[in-house]
Amino acid sequence: MCESRSWLYFTVLVVFVAQAAVAADVVPTEVDMPGTQPGEVGNLESPSRCDNCHAGYNNESTAVAGQGAPQDEPFTGWQGGPMANAGRDPIFWATLAIAEQDFDGAGDLCLRCHSQGGWYGGRSTPTDGSGLATSDSDGVDCDGCHLMTNSDNSEHVGVMVSPFIANCVADPLLPDKSCDSAGEGFYGNGMLSLWGGSEKMGPYADADARHPFLQSRFNRNVDFCGSCHDVSNPVVGDLAPNNGKQHKAPHVVSSQDYYNGVANLGGPREEKAAFNNPPYAYGIVERTFSEYKASALPTTRVSAFQTLPEDLRVVGGSLEVTYQAALAAGTEGDYADGEERFFSCQSCHMRPVTSAGANKNGLQIRPDLARHDHAGGNYWLVDMIQYQQAHSLLRFGEGVTDSHLAQLAAGRARAVEHLRQAASLVVDSDFLKIINLTGHKLITGYPEGRRMWLNIKWRGPGGALLREDGAYGPLFNENGEPVLVENPAGGPDVQVESILEPDSPNVRIYEAHYAITSEWAATLIASGKSPDLARSYDRPDDEVTMSLGEMASQPA
């Protein structure tokens, strides 16, 4: 087997602890970030208002007639997708709890995207999410996108009040700071610039909306999606000795620049990294958007699909399916209004369909309505929500409706479909070639919860199984005893399932490997963090294999 493997280097999401971990009522300046702030826009509406018009009008008859299926309705597709359910994600809530233990107030960063309505409505403090309303579980809601303006102020100008300006206009350029140009917006971390008027925004010039409306070209811009899908840790960005940046990356301006290289915990926000640098520059956590921007796809028109390398033109692969969906609009791959369509985030994750956008009489059937399902690969989210709903374990107790559950099931199927489109495998003699058919790294996004591996079964004469590499199944400890965890719904403990022999030389696992420097570990200890804090564990017995103190003693 021949394999090309690239390692991803991340700064561990570990931050200063100044006191016992309790939810913060005031967001620390290290966690504060630019963009529209809570309470600054008063025109936010519940998604239930959008449901009145943007769902419930497509049916079997319209689908047969080629005029749209129920899943093509904006609200219906959204309701079954990951964005609508970001505030219900149990992994999010578990991660939020851990972040709050590490740094009091860190949860504000998480809630900014996972509960947009709650954050902009001023309910994100206490920062453990205990102040949120039940309706805030809708996650990334309609107004979060349809009030978003470009933070570089190149089109409609959203609400941003100094010092919360999410662009480089007031910042010196390289080499003094990491901005490339004075017009560069801060795209990442949910630092949105929201429109303060009553209009909803969308990409069409001819929308016959029954509410105030403005055309926004930003809705088709890839920076629109980048506004959330580069995630950086602003605390690491400001306080860590290397600011959590890539090796040899440009200098990151932080509070350390004001105090002779010493971080100023709790200092003015104007000194902090998040207020002086684009988010891709510091505190690396997730880089889906940056991965995409580093590829050739942002400048490749969908109509140029046939010029792509043969390996990428796999029938049924992500790029080919996107190409076919765009062709159906009848404009050789471009938008129906003549605008050039590139292999953008929207082209792949909001593929065009033929449907009306609302239930009002006389609305045109558009050949390139963007499907609002935002499908990715996270099908397991639906499994968890369904389980918690069935056992009354959802974070917000009122649960979800039967209709919502049906949309979740449909969303799960779309996520599985996207996973199948993401890669192709080519076997040539004793070589296996893995081809990435996505616009970013093949595993991307949340690095603590994503991995990919090869499950290879070697068979002999008659199909007899000779060996299996990368097998997945129930775990046992070194004594042959089942590895069990507590059943959250009560009843018998549950045996853990995972990759059975992850350290075997024949097993290929692709995942992010975290790392911190010894200087960062020493800085954490100097700030009051216990040197006994576990940094790594044995699997599956949970024995500590390295502490923070041991990490700090490693050579620089």
Predicted segments, located by residue:
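N-terminal module-boundary/linker segments of secreted carbohydrate-active enzymes
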Residues: 24-64
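Bacterial N-terminal signal peptides that target proteins for export
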Residues: 1-10
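Short cysteine-rich clusters marking metal-coordination/redox-active sites
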Residues: 50-53, 110-113, 142, 225, ...
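Conserved, well-structured interaction surfaces
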Residues: 107, 112-124
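Primarily the internal scaffold of c-type cytochrome electron-transfer domains
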Residues: 25-33, 60-95, 127-556
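Residues immediately within or flanking Cys/His clusters that coordinate Zn2+
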Residues: 43-48, 103, 107, 137-139, ...
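Membrane helical hairpin/interfacial module
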Residues: 97-103
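Bacterial N-terminal signal peptides
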Residues: 9-19
